[in-house]
Design a protein with these regions (language model features):
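Short, high-confidence coil segments that cap the C-terminus of an alpha-helix
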Residues: 40, 90, 120-121
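Short phosphate-binding loop-to-helix
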Residues: 44, 50-94, 102-113
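Structural beta-sheet core signal
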Residues: 4-6, 45, 95, 123-126
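Histidine-centered beta-alpha loop that forms part of the nucleotide-sugar donor binding/catalytic region
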Residues: 9, 68, 97, 128-129
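N-terminal glycine-rich phosphate-binding loop and ensuing alpha1 helix
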Residues: 2-47
C-alpha cells in the first residue's frame, strides 16, 4: 500500500519552527498534509518536536516519533527515510518536503505512475530547472553577456 512520509524537524536554525510558520493563514506543514491527503490517508509525519506532533495529531495524521539523533543539523533525509521504513511496512512510498507549499498532488501521482506502472523505474525524483545569473567579485558577468541575457520566460 502506498504511503507518504513528510519529514518535519522542529529545530531549524535559520527559521525557528519553520514548519509551523503561518503562510497565508495556515502553518506551512498543513499545505503538505492537505496535498498528500488528496492521494491517500496513509500520510506519516516524522518529527522530534512536541508542538509539531500535537499539530499533526490534531489533523488526524500519523506521527512517527523521530529519535533526537535523527533531528540534528547534520541528520539527513536518507536517515529519516531509513527510520520510517523501520517503523512502517510499505513497498511503495513518497517523501514530500513540507517546505514546498505549492506542490501539486498530480506531481506525486505522476511519479507514482512511473514506478507502479509498466515502466521499470524503482525510484523517481522531481526537479525543476533553475536559471541563475552570476557575476564575479568585480561585477563582470560569468555565465551570460550583458545586453544579451534571456528573460526567464524565454528559457526552455
Amino acid at each position: 500500500m502506498f504511503k507518504i512520509l513528510i519529514p518535519a524537524r522542529g529545530g531549524s536554525k535559520r527559521i525557528p519552527k519553520k514548519n509551523l510558520v503561518d503562510v497565508n493563514g495556515k502553518p506551512l506543514l498543513q499545505y503538505a498534509i492537505e496535498t498528500c491527503r488528496k492521494i491517500t490517508d496513509n500520510v506519516y509525519v516524522s518529527t522530534e518536536d512536541n508542538e509539531i506532533q500535537a499539530f499533526v495529531e490534531s489533523m488526524n495524521v500519523n506521527v512517527i516519533e523521530r529519535p533526537d539523533r535523527l533531528a540534528q543539523d547534520d541528520s539527513t533525509t536518507e536517515d529519516v527515510v531509513e527510520h520510517f521504513l523501520e517503523e512502517v511496512d510499505t513497498d511503495l512510498f513518497c517523501v514530500v518536503q513540507p517546505t514546498s507549499p505549492f506542490l501539486n498532488f498530480n506531481s506525486i501521482l505522476d511519479g507514482m505512475e512511473l514506478i507502479d506502472g509498466k515502466l521499470e523505474y524503482d525510484s523517481v525524483i522531481s526537479v525543476c530547472k533553475e536559471i541563475n545569473y552570476y557575476w564575479d567579485i568585480n561585477g563582470k558577468p560569468i555565465n551570460f553577456e550583458l545586453g544579451n541575457r534571456k528573460r526567464t520566460q524565454e528559457h526552455e
